[in-house]
Structure formats: structure tokens, C-alpha cells
Regions:
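Exposed beta-sheet edge and beta->alpha loop/turn motif
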Residues: 29-51, 153-234
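A short, amphipathic edge element
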Residues: 135-154
Length: 234
């Protein structure tokens, strides 16, 4: 019983506190005419989209009786290196796609490429162990967690740091199946109905954007950062 409770708590942390990740679906990322300046005209508000995947054979979705086969593996998009708003968008898309891929495969490798400071990796280790120990898997949805950006552009909060508010939710059919017969829906991990509000915190380090998440209620806005949000300067 203690093991189950521990895993349940870990999933709650991983999926809820770890931003309740976003959706891994088709991309709308488009190139800027000038990569040295931010795209201040385009609105990025809305459903997050991503399409940078590695072909790994025929994808067979998971069911209650078997885990997924060959789920599409996200690869870091080149735009993640662009010091622009578009670069931040690409990094967030990769973070979310990597988290959903982890839920379906137990493979944490892509996630490490965007969480280079290991801010959220420890929250995801329960999923790695679930697959590694052959004690269970996720089924019911190709994107267990989805979300959308609720702001047109990110807000600058430091010399090399930005934050971007998102609204996230669990897929109602996403279910953790344990090999001993128990099942746990992602929705049951929720502390209440509705969506979750989070911030993605982005920082440009060593030529690439790194991403972590932070509950919106724990983040406060300063006058200087609010003033800079209307025109993102990267």
C-alpha cells in the first residue's frame, strides 16, 4: 500500500506541479523574417503546437492490456536555439511533447534536453520507474496532458529570463494501468475541477532555451517586468 501511495503522490507532483504538461500535436511554428529580433506582431496565444518528431516505426497506441508501441519521439527543434519569442515557443512545445512522450514510453531522454538544470526531472522519475520495473503504463490518450498559452507573448522578468502563462488540463480518458490490475485516472489526481494555471519559466543558457514550470499563484509580477511584457525584448 505504501508503494502505491508513494507512486500516486509522485504522479500528482509530476503531472500537476510539473505543469500538467501540454499537448503534442501539429505545429504552427513559422520562421521570422529577422531571427535577431523578436516577433512582436504575431500572437502566440492559444493551443500549443509542435511537430518535430523522429519516425520510429508504426505507432500502436496503448490499451488496458498492453503498453504503447513506437510512440513518436520528439526531437529538439532548431528554433530552440533562436534568441527570439519564436525560439521560446519552440522550447515550450518541446518540453510538453517530451513530457507526454515520457508518460507513454517511460523514456526521459528528450526531457533532459530541455530541462538541463534538472528542475522538473525529479518530478518525472515515477513514470520512468513505472516502465523500467514493468509495473504499469499509461493509456487512453496520445496526449495525456494538454494546455494552451493564455498570453500573446512572454513577459521578461530578468536579463535572460522570461515567463509565459499557460492553462493546462488532463485528458479525461488518460489512465495509469498497473500490472496488478489497479487503475488510476489522471483526472483523479486533480485537487479540483477545471484547468490549472502555470507559468513556463524560460532562460537562455549556452545558446539554447531551458524550460521549467512554476505555479501561477507562487509567481508575482514586478512593475518593471510588467512594463516590459508589452514588447518582448530578447
Amino acid at each position: 500500500m505504501s508503494t502505491f501511495v508513494t507512486r500516486r503522490a509522485a504522479f500528482g507532483i509530476a503531472a500537476t506541479a510539473a505543469l500538467a504538461s501540454l499537448t503534442a500535436c501539429a505545429s504552427d511554428i513559422r520562421p521570422l523574417s529577422n531571427q535577431s529580433t523578436p516577433d512582436t506582431q504575431r500572437s502566440y496565444k492559444g493551443e500549443l503546437k509542435f511537430d518535430s518528431y523522429e519516425s520510429r516505426g508504426t505507432y500502436v497506441p496503448a490499451t488496458r492490456s498492453k503498453k504503447a508501441e513506437n510512440p513518436p519521439k520528439p526531437i529538439p527543434p532548431a528554433k530552440m536555439r533562436a534568441k527570439t519569442t519564436e525560439g521560446m515557443y519552440a522550447a515550450i512545445g518541446f518540453w510538453v511533447a517530451s513530457f507526454n512522450y515520457l508518460l507513454l514510453s517511460g523514456d526521459i531522454e528528450p526531457f533532459r534536453a530541455v530541462d538541463t538544470n534538472r528542475n522538473d526531472i525529479y518530478k518525472a522519475e515515477a513514470f520512468v520507474e513505472l516502465y523500467k520495473n514493468n509495473t504499469g503504463w499509461m493509456y487512453g490518450s496520445d496526449s495525456p496532458i494538454s494546455a494552451e498559452l493564455t498570453e500573446d507573448h512572454p513577459e521578461k522578468v530578468g536579463e535572460q529570463q522570461y515567463r509565459w502563462r499557460i492553462s493546462s488540463r488532463y485528458h479525461k480518458e488518460a489512465t495509469i494501468h498497473y500490472t496488478d490490475g489497479r487503475e488510476l485516472t489522471m483526472a483523479s489526481l486533480s485537487s479540483g475541477p477545471g484547468d490549472y494555471e502555470f507559468f513556463f519559466i524560460l532562460e537562455y543558457q549556452d545558446g539554447v532555451w531551458t524550460v521549467r514550470n512554476e505555479p501561477a499563484k507562487l509567481t508575482t509580477s514586478s512593475p518593471s517586468s510588467s512594463a516590459s511584457s508589452s514588447s518582448t525584448s530578447v
